Amino acid sequence: MERYKALEQLLTELDDFLKVLDQENLSSAAVLKKSGLSELLRLYTKSSSSDEEYIYMNKVSVNGEQNSASPDKVPEEQGPLTNGEPSQHSSAPQKSLPDLPPPKMIPERKQPTVPKIESPEGYYEEAEPFDRSINEDGEAVSSSYESYDEDENSKGKAAPYQWPSPEASIELMRDARICAFLWRKKWLGQWAKQLCVIRDTRLLCYKSSKDHSPQLDVNLRGSSVVHKEKQVRKKGHKLKITPMNADVIVLGLQSKDQAEQWLRVIQEVSGLPSEGASEGNQYTPDAQRLNCQKPDIAEKYLSAAEYGITINGHPEIPETKDVKKKCSAGLKLSNLMNLGRKKSTSLEPPERSLETSSYLNVLVNSQWKSRWCFVRDSHLHFYQDRNRSKVAQQPLSLVGCDVLPDPSPDHLYSFRILHNGEELAKLEAKSSEEMGHWLGLLLSESGSKTDPEELTYDYVDAERVSCIVSAAKTSLLLMQRKFSEPNTYIDGLPSRDCQDDLYDDVEVSELIAVVEPAEEAAPAVDANSGSEPDRVYLDLTPVKSFLHSSSEAQAQASLPAVPHQDDVAETLTVDPKPGTTPEEPHTESPGDPEVQQRQPEVQESSEPIEPTPRITMVKLQAEQQRISFPANCPDTMASAPIAASPPVKEKLRVTSAEIKLGKNRTEAEVKRYTEEKERLERSKEEIRGHLAQLRREKRELKETLLRCTDKGVLAKLEQTLKKIDEECRMEESRRVDLELSIMEVKDNLKKAEAGPVTLGTTVDTTHLDNMSPRPQPKAATPNPPPDSTPVNSASVLKNRPLSVMVTGKGTVLQKAKEWEKKGAS
């Protein structure tokens, strides 16, 4: 009996010693020996248990008074029984026992649960392992058909690590750094237990220990690895391995010690500096970020519980899943809905519009936390999630703030927001492109005049700096265009101070003024009729020299030289004479002293009464009317409103002149913008060709660098590579500016092709005065009101207030732009 007790104690001590060795860093030979001892100990323990059960079921009672003992009275652990003489205290039979069958290699399992009647297929849903991460509901479509023949039912009673069995091929473990049976996550969210071996720099995964060809063979050189820990019943530790040129690999481990051991081995193989085993620490080279960008895009805005631990270093507590969901068979309706939703979001265009919100890591109380950041109205808002249901912290005002990159080895794409030298927030992006995008957004909202190229980037890689600067400039320019895009209803309105510059670059058409012959003029209007004279519109084309008459003396000095004839180019309203009817207007020449005295009186009386912009317009037009034309000009004649004859011919001729003027202006603008567009397109093609050539030279230079061994030549090649990188950045910047210029020229070309009237704005004719005179009582004041001054019809149309305008399709375009702005915000 002492021998059996010593043997039992030896087995216990050996088991404890093997557990201690699990926490040590052993060589490959020691690992193999330890795994062999663990397997032998497990086999001996199982075989002794099976022998005990067999003997217990077949034992006989020596005394008739003794009955079979119940199972509860028999101790669970007994030493192996040997044949001997029967005694009163021995329950073994007298004769030798038959040869026992070899114990089966079946690991212990708990009592199987009886499947429910309503879900006969629940057995497949309960296959080990069942749990999934929170965001994997829509991915569990298959039922793991290929893993039915695997050992998936082993529980925690066995050894902490399941090592390869003795019948496994020794070649699988030869020269292996580490090997064990681990869970490997497949592409549909399934988990399969496979034999994972790290040999040299490669990770090999076998379906079973008897296979000779691996299911997965990946080179771990240059790969990154992240350790994640979750408080769940199974697979509480995961390793996410991101190789250089392969898909992401997720391994499930049973304990933290095993996870740390595998993490240390993988980091040694990958050649990356050790980051420790703490959760959330990871080191991802920039080249790997560029190569493995595609598989990570779909996970960009998913929960961090899928493949990574929380940013603040605390393990996440998964949501409690419904028990009914585990027992039911097949794919749930919620899974189908989630699956469709994920597919629809992945098919959306990545750059639907200028994105002003995304997930960023925010430093809060010395801990990094993931927050949904949103920029609006020069404020940076922080939310717990993208639904904006809960505010994480108070909004941050960006006005007057500075944005500075602040990279570190652990956080490559972090940047700070400062106000008067005081740090307000520290943020971190997920990639160089996203960092540049947010730098441009924040610089635009803060009102800073700093160019993204002027910021200090502490990066060695020139491509990374170029990517950040390019993304920052793009988002900065897009923000400027978004909030300063042209408004066709307020942009380009003529200034009141420079009315003369509107048509300076357009060929002046012939001046047409139609007037009735002098002999057909009616007598003067009756002075007692009391009718107020109507406003008279002279269809004169404005010329630059007309409006640049600086003084009234110069304008009046030219009046005596004008002969008293009917072919003068000015028509004024005159006080009606007695004895005439209101329907008979009278035309006086500008040579009459009454007319010459009345014009200064109108100007002098109008200026102190209404010092408004309208007076300036009337004065300017009054100066414009004092223009003399030579008597031998056949096309220049004085015009007066005639009620007796229809003015159809006059209107047609005036309209044709104005249309000709607008047509000439439109053709000139269309031609100019078309030439500008063609020139920019040619420059764009040249820049593209130059960029392609530079990139080709850069690629060839990199290949030469890889093959070169001479240090002197290597330094020269690196210097040349830096110059080519700088040229690429400059050409890319020129290309971006050129693209924006082309877009602006195209918009101007469309406006020019639409015609002289901006965006279909029409003039309401009901607000315009009729050309025919109407009988009205004469004003009591001797001086006529300022409105009686003759004005130019073209100038009046241009200076008419916006309230007179009737917007047709322009209203539709304006509303469409407002809706677009609302949708973008």
UniProtKB/Swiss-Prot annotation:
The modification Phosphotyrosine is found at Y56, Y413. Residues 657-754 form a coiled coil. It is found in: Cytoplasm. Tyrosine phosphorylated (by SRC). SUPFAM superfamilies: PH domain-like. GO terms for molecular function: protein tyrosine kinase activator activity; SH2 domain binding; SH3 domain binding. SMART domains: PH (SM00233). This is Actin filament-associated protein 1-like 2.
